[in-house]
Design a protein with these regions (language model features):
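Catalytic cores of carbohydrate-active enzymes across secretory and cytosolic contexts
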Residues: 1-242
């Protein structure tokens, strides 16, 4: 969801973003075969100011896109009843491993990527759908083979559901597809507080399309009810049993 690359590039909120940014910088320095996926945020995270009363207040402002190059790749993710087409940008500075950011093409869909960590439940699920489902589709469209997926916190968990759905569509059953997927996913979580371990109503996950045609019973097996993104990540990782 966030990458702390430079203070001029408003794609991070705090420590998780700094960690992800350092990861990408180190991978670039070492020449490791790593590719990052994120979203291009119009307003980034809040810019705080201190008011005359001494209290902090949030301010939101639109930022220029930054050092981005259009790859020409477009991917689609169905969010509820709307097909959201996303362009795929490549970050072109900061000496990092390849990093691609998705952004809706149609301005009517950019409410999804307006603000990092938008608290509205539907918006947050939609953000994580573009990151996870859209991210998998972007990697395919870029013809980048993937040996291992790393979900850093639960935000990218819907990528796992997309991969399960792909295996089912190819003729597999749910449990076999889920078991096979575990060998391709590692999961890390760093925020042992409720705010860092998102829970969504399973009805919202299903209604918005994040379940990728999986039925509610299958979604419950992965993330519980309500759907816990961290639990889903833990259950989908290598040797994941919970």
């Amino acid at each position: 969801m966030e990458y702390g690359l430079h203070e001029e590039f408003h794609s991070y909120a705090g420590g998780l973003g700094v960690l992800a940014g350092d990861f990408m910088k180190s991978a670039g320095d070492l020449g490791l075969p790593v590719v990052g996926i994120g979203l291009r945020w119009a307003q980034g995270y809040t810019a705080q100011r201190i008011g005359p009363d001494g209290y902090p207040y949030d301010e939101w402002r639109d930022y220029p896109p930054g050092p981005l190059t259009d790859t020409g790749i477009r991917v689609r993710v169905r969010v509820a009843a709307r097909e959201v087409e996303c362009c795929v940008w490549r970050v072109g500075r900061y000496a990092i491993a390849p990093l691609f950011l998705l952004e809706p093409v149609d301005v009517r869909d950019r409410w999804i990527t307006r603000r990092l960590y938008d608290p509205a439940p539907d918006c947050r699920v939609a953000q994580e759908m573009l990151l996870g489902i859209g991210g998998v589709r972007a990697l395919r469209a870029l013809h980048l083979p993937v040996d291992l997926y790393h979900f850093n916190e639960g935000h990218a968990v819907f990528a796992g559901i997309e991969l399960i759905a792909d295996r089912i569509e190819a003729g597999g059953d749910f449990h076999t597809a889920w078991e096979e997927l575990r060998e391709k996913i590692v999961f890390t979580t760093h925020t042992p507080v409720p705010a860092g371990n998102e829970i969504h109503a399973i009805e919202d996950v299903h209604r918005l399309g994040a379940g990728c045609e999986l039925v509610k019973a299958e979604l419950r097996e992965i993330g519980g009810n309500p759907f816990n993104m961290t639990v889903a990540g833990l259950r989908s990782r290598r040797s994941g049993r919970l």
